[in-house]
UniProtKB/Swiss-Prot annotation:
Keywords: Cell membrane, Ion transport, Membrane, Sodium, Sodium transport, Symport, Transmembrane, Transmembrane helix, Transport. It comes from Cupriavidus necator (strain ATCC 17699 / DSM 428 / KCTC 22496 / NCIMB 10442 / H16 / Stanier 337). This is Uncharacterized symporter H16_A2524. Belongs to the sodium:solute symporter (SSF) (TC 2.A.21) family. It is found in: Cell membrane. The lineage of its organism: Bacteria, Pseudomonadati, Pseudomonadota, Betaproteobacteria, Burkholderiales.
């Protein structure tokens, strides 16, 4: 067996080495085509379609109906390649697209994501990885049902049921974020509408996972990791070399950051910049007056908007103006309560733009000491939620089942940290490089001479980039630029003036990041529903073939529903990902840790703990996140000023407390559970 595993590893090294060489050759060939004046749009098509075709071929080659292959890739994935697959599973659209963007927009505060996501793997390696692999199984609900099952065949059904619900919910929220990332990439680089881009992405996701399950997903994820890391590192190095003559800008990040800080301070002192911020200060005052006059102001603003729209139609105004006003009318609040919520948010945005821009180096910038304390609290709690969420995500933990041994599992986590760090040490550098490009080549530019990339990105729907001459001086000011952080990485090659082939490469990398995570998430949901619900709760006599077929049908249904939800545009990518982490942490972290390290934890305690943790986190998000408050009309107060993305800060303690209290109030577990815990922790 060791010799066979060694031959298998050498064969994989050869295959993926050739794939990497082929990737560089393909990029070089596309560069030559661009130099020969090939259409840039067609280059974008080729990059996206060729890479998806490669993933589809791997998925087709790895198709299987074997149960072990479909659920856990026969538990024979070597540590090196499982580390790459974990990294690809982990480095979602949020990491690839969103991380550099949030560092660009928020500066120091964005480091919470780097610290939380990286630190979480320490918890995985020391608290969970060896014990879950030693148990085996197919899903996380499998482990929980057995640990809290008191030796019953099939384990404890209530524990399994609530674990399936929690796994499906947090994975589904995360899945929506990935499909949204795919839609953004496709919309920009192929030029289709966002809804069409979503279903294009759906096809890409399904070709990787539908036929081969975990086996197909594992080997496509290895290829996708290579694609995304090559795309990211090449882009960072080329931007740095073109403008700063450095091939490894990560080593001089501190110097670049000092230059940025000096430029930011200079901008804040310029009169034109101050005039723009004064405009937004006045807008905030007007919105406050409008809020104070509710509900009368609601009817007045609605009627005024209707009158303007009717006037445009009567005068046969340009269709663009009519469409813009129709969109504004469609987004107008439906009642005074919703108006108050929306105008409060707009007032907060205007106030934020009226203040000094966020420094790249200043921790917790704020106008008052109380606001600074609130920001510090949110920073710390977000790091906490991301760390424990990392250690609780079902699609990551399931990968621990795919290695040949406990030792290989530990090694694969170590490799995963290394592969993830390659991107994470480069993301802050890319954010700084792109911001430097903004300061050098956009801020201070006449509006009549805007670069072509600005024109292109202003056309993207939903809007991700906007710029308006607020003070009427005809010159772009820093405060006049409004952008979604998600566009920074995708636009980076164009902003830096690199060849379009690099834009195609970064788009292919972003697509790989979204597809790799989406595949893992989709498989987690489908396997939980087919294995834990269908097999364990509906039909215990189902054949292996029927179970795999059921998993494929469920996978297709979940993918279609997730695409529909994504088309509703529920929020930015980074918030959805953060919410998924809080939900996973609140529901799974307490019962996993207690289940391994405290023998006294009972099934009743586990059910109550998961329900309490998940319930608290879901409630806090629903009553505080604008997308849900607009839908439900329910508005809540933020506890201690904590953002809804960090709802796990309340859910995790609630889960621990309830699980411990209920366990102490209920009878002890059967001796078989004590023996199971001893076995897991032995050696």
């Amino acid at each position: 067996m060791p010799e066979a595993q060694s031959r298998f590893r050498r064969r994989l090294l050869l295959y993926y080495g050739l794939f990497t060489l082929g990737l560089f050759g393909f990029v070089g060939m596309m560069g030559l085509l661009e130099k020969s004046n090939a259409d840039a749009l067609w280059l974008g098509y080729v990059f996206l379609f060729i890479t998806i075709a490669i993933y589809a071929c791997i998925g087709l080659i790895c198709r299987t109906s074997d149960l072990n292959e479909y659920y856990v890739a026969s538990r024979r994935v070597p540590a090196l390649f499982n580390g790459m697959a974990i990294a690809a599973d982990w480095m979602s659209a949020a990491s690839f697209i969103g991380l550099a963007g949030i560092l660009f927009a928020s500066g120091y505060e964005g480091l919470a994501y780097v610290m939380g996501w990286t630190g979480g793997y320490c918890l995985v390696a020391f608290l969970l990885a060896p014990y879950l692999r030693k148990y085996g199984g197919y899903t996380i609900p499998d482990f929980l049902a057995a640990r809290y099952g008191n030796g019953k065949p099939g384990g404890n059904l209530p524990v399994r049921a609530i674990a399936v619900l929690a796994a499906s919910l947090c994975s589904f929220v995360y899945l929506v974020a990935q499909i949204q990332g795919v839609g953004l990439v496709v919309t920009r680089f192929i030029g289709v509408e966002f809804a069409v881009g979503i279903f294009f992405g759906l096809a890409g996701i399904l070709v990787c996972s539908f036929l081969g399950g975990m086996r197909a997903v594992t080997w496509t994820q290895v290829a996708q990791y290579i694609m995304m890391i090559v795309a990211f590192l090449v882009t960072v190095s080329m931007i740095a070399w073109k403008h700063h003559h450095e091939a490894l800008p990560q080593l001089s990040y501190g110097t670049l950051l000092s230059q940025l800080d000096a430029r930011e301070q200079q901008l804040e002192r310029e009169p034109a910049e101050q005039a723009v911020r004064e405009y937004y200060r006045q807008q905030a005052i007007l919105l406050q007056e409008r809020i104070a006059r509710l509900p009368d102001s609601f009817a007045q603003e609605r009627d005024a908007l209707d009158a303007r729209l009717q006037d445009l139609r009567t005068r046969n105004a340009p269709l663009r103006d009519i469409k813009s006003l129709e969109r504004e009318r469609l987004e107008f609040p439906r009642d005074p309560a919703a108006a108050q919520q929306q105008w409060n948010q707009q007032r907060a945005d205007a106030l934020a733009r009226s203040r000094h821009s966020l420094s790249s180096t200043e921790p917790y910038p704020a106008a008052s000491e109380q606001e600074r304390k609130t920001k510090r609290l949110n920073f710390v709690l977000l790091v906490f939620c991301l760390m424990v969420g990392t250690a609780s995500l079902p699609h990551i933990l399931t990968r621990l089942y795919t290695t040949p041994s406990v030792k290989e599992t530990r090694n694969s986590v170590a490799w995963a940290v290394f592969f993830i760090a390659l991107l994470y040490v480069s993301a802050p550098t890319l954010a700084a490089l792109v911001k430097f490009e903004f300061f050098q080549h956009l801020v201070g530019t006449p509006y009549a001479e805007l670069p072509q990339w600005v024109v292109q990105w202003r056309k993207v729907d939903p809007p991700v980039f906007g710029i308006r001459d607020v003070n009427g001086d005809g010159i772009v000011q820093w405060a006049e630029i409004l952008l979604q952080p998600d566009m920074i990485v995708l636009a980076a090659p164009e902003i830096a003036g690199l060849p379009y082939v690099i834009s195609g490469l970064i788009a292919a990398g972003a697509l790989a990041a979204a597809l790799s995570t989406a595949d893992g998430l989709l498989l987690t949901i489908a396997n939980a529903l087919s294995h834990d619900v269908f097999y364990h709760m509906v039909d215990r006599q189902a054949s292996h073939q029927r179970r795999v077929t059921t998993a494929k049908i469920v996978l297709l249904g979940v993918a279609l529903f997730a695409s529909y939800v994504t088309s509703l545009r529920p929020g930015n990518i980074l918030f959805l990902v953060g919410a998924a982490f809080s939900l996973a942490a609140s529901s799974f972290f307490p019962v996993l840790v207690l289940g391994i390290f405290w023998r006294r934890t009972t099934a009743a305690g586990a059910v109550a703990g998961m329900a309490a943790g998940l319930g608290v986190a879901v409630y806090y998000i629903i009553v505080n996140y604008p997308f849900f408050t607009r839908m439900t009309g329910i508005f809540g107060n933020r506890w201690f000023g904590v953002d809804p993305i960090a709802s796990g800060a309340f859910g995790v303690p609630a889960g621990f407390a309830v699980a411990i209290i209920v366990s102490l109030l209920t009878p002890r577990n059967a001796p078989v559970i004590d023996r199971l815990v001893s076995y897991l922790r032995k050696g």
